């Protein structure tokens, strides 16, 4: 390792301090190198001081308080006993997770190693309560917190059997108060911000949300915000939150983004999504009480929102069929100049039968051939043509008035035309004969009347 290689393993602030010293006193570099090597060789011992060996048996005479058979979720998942006791080595308080009297995880020097502890409600399970204990960093690395679940009925029964509370007591707050006092005796504090009997300066609450694909609970406490309880569990000091913003607001949900002042390794922005709209007022009141800056209307977010809305509305920017038709009529000037295709594919036009506003000329043709086909229609179900004519009249009456108005504006009206149809403008009808084959025997059997080729 070269002279300054070890500096790259240190925080930048510490690197700068060491470089300033070594510039003034070059011989000190060797001392810093030795100190770094010593720290590496003894880092395992530092961690071991926080834990007892897995086969350490706890003397019952050293137990201050114990809670049997609780569900531990972190740092290990197991049914264990929570025990506050004195160390058999230095007789200082320790917190241990124990199975059959043997410690599987233990924290010593609780006053220095425990950052905070709190009771938290379990959403939709009023008979359960979380105990969350956050540990301080070791070598700038976050440690998994202690998280366990207590069953209120079981704890009440256990406390009564140990004589810690009276048999008539059913208030679980009596149990939490006793546990808090035992924790204070061993060097750390456990908060109970959701205790309804104690007025809080900042009301605590929790909301359901998602972080990415992980569903969890966001707890807003007087001094901290916790997201759990799937790893990594996130803990934010409210004083370390620079600003907050709201986004993706819908009728039912919205998103919240917390922006931290200092990057602690996770990043500075944390977005929580799918929060119920009914929770907005609680979060907004919390933000105002903590004097956190609301960045929802920042220029950056407004630009992102505008860009997102533009992308979502790209399809609406495309001209609709009605707009295309209007443009075509304005360009060509007169609907009579629009070419008619005699081989129009009716099957390809999905709206042909339901939404057609124009006659296909069959009425004119029927008028021209009415006298010639009158006797044939009477012999072969003459009601056919009459019913067809009545259906055309119904369709005309139900035609979209908006389209009628549109066409009347863009097409000159010819009131004197004898061929004026539904919209009172001339329609040039192609003059050609359509051969009609009459097969009396088949028509009588099928009742079809007339066949069109």
Curated annotation (Swiss-Prot):
- Acidic residues composition bias: residue spans: 340-395
List the Gene Ontology MF annotations in alphabetical order.
double-stranded DNA binding; histone binding; identical protein binding; nucleosome binding
Q: What is its main location?
A: nucleus
Q: Name its cellular compartments.
A: Nucleus; Chromosome
| A cellular component annotation (GO) from this entry | chromosome
Composition bias type Polar residues, residue spans: 316-334, 397-420
Disordered: region residues: 299-426
Q: In which domain of life is the source organism classified? A: Eukaryota
**Pfam families, alphabetized:** PH_18, Rtt106_N, Rttp106-like_middle
Q: Give the compositionally biased regions (Low complexity).
A: 304-315
Q: Which keywords label this protein?
A: Chaperone, Chromosome, DNA-binding, Nucleus, Transcription, Transcription regulation
UniProt record similarity statement? Belongs to the RTT106 family.
Quaternary state and interactors? Interacts with histones H3 and H4.
What function is annotated for this protein? Histones H3 and H4 chaperone involved in the nucleosome formation and heterochromatin silencing. Required for the deposition of H3K56ac-carrying H3-H4 complex onto newly-replicated DNA. Plays a role in the transcriptional regulation of the cell-cycle dependent histone genes by creating a repressive structure at the core histone gene promoter.
Protein name per Swiss-Prot or TrEMBL = Histone chaperone RTT106
The species this protein was found in:
Candida glabrata (strain ATCC 2001 / BCRC 20586 / JCM 3761 / NBRC 0622 / NRRL Y-65 / CBS 138) (Yeast)
- Gene encoding this chain? RTT106
């Amino acid at each position: 390792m070269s002279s300054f290689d070890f500096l790259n393993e240190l925080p930048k602030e510490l690197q700068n301090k060491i470089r300033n010293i070594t510039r003034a006193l070059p011989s000190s570099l060797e001392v810093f190198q030795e100190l770094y090597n010593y720290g590496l060789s003894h880092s395992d011992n530092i961690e071991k001081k926080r834990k007892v060996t897995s086969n350490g048996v706890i003397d019952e005479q050293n137990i201050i308080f114990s809670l049997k058979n609780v569900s531990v979720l972190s740092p290990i998942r197991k049914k264990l006993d929570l025990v506050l006791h004195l160390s058999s080595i230095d007789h200082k308080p320790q917190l241990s997770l124990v199975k059959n009297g043997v410690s599987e995880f233990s924290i010593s020097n609780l006053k220095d190693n425990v950052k905070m502890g709190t009771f938290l409600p379990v959403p939709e399970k009023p008979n359960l309560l979380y105990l969350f204990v956050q540990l301080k960093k070791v070598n700038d690395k976050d440690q998994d917190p202690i998280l366990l679940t207590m069953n209120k009925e079981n704890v009440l029964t256990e406390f009564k059997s140990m004589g810690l509370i009276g048999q008539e007591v059913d208030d679980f707050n009596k149990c939490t108060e006793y546990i808090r006092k035992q924790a204070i005796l061993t060097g750390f504090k456990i908060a109970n911000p959701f205790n309804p009997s104690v007025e809080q300066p900042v009301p605590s609450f929790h909301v359901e949300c998602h972080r990415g694909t992980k569903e969890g609970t966001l707890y807003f406490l007087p001094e901290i915000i916790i997201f759990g309880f799937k790893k990594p569990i996130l803990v934010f000091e409210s004083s370390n939150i620079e600003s907050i913003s709201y986004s993706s607001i819908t009728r039912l949900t919205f998103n919240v983004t917390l922006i931290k002042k200092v990057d602690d390794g996770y990043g500075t922005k944390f977005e929580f999504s799918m929060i119920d709209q009914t929770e907005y007022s609680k979060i907004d009141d919390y933000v105002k009480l903590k004097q956190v800056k609301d960045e929802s209307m920042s220029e950056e977010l407004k630009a992102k929102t505008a860009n997102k809305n533009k992308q979502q509305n790209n399809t609406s920017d495309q001209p609709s069929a009605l707009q295309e038709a209007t443009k075509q009529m304005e360009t060509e000037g007169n609907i009579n100049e629009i070419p008619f295709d005699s081989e129009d594919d009716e099957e390809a036009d999905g709206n042909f039968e339901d939404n057609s506003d124009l006659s296909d000329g069959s009425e004119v043709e029927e008028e021209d051939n009415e006298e010639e086909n009158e006797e044939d229609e009477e012999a072969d179900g003459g009601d056919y043509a009459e019913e067809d004519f009545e259906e055309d009249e119904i369709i005309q009456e139900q035609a979209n008035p908006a389209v009628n108005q549109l066409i009347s504006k863009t097409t000159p009206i010819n009131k004197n035309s004898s061929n004026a149809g539904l919209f009172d403008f001339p329609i040039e009808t192609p003059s050609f004969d359509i051969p009609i084959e009459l097969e009396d025997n088949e028509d009588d059997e099928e009742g079809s009347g007339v066949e069109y080729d």
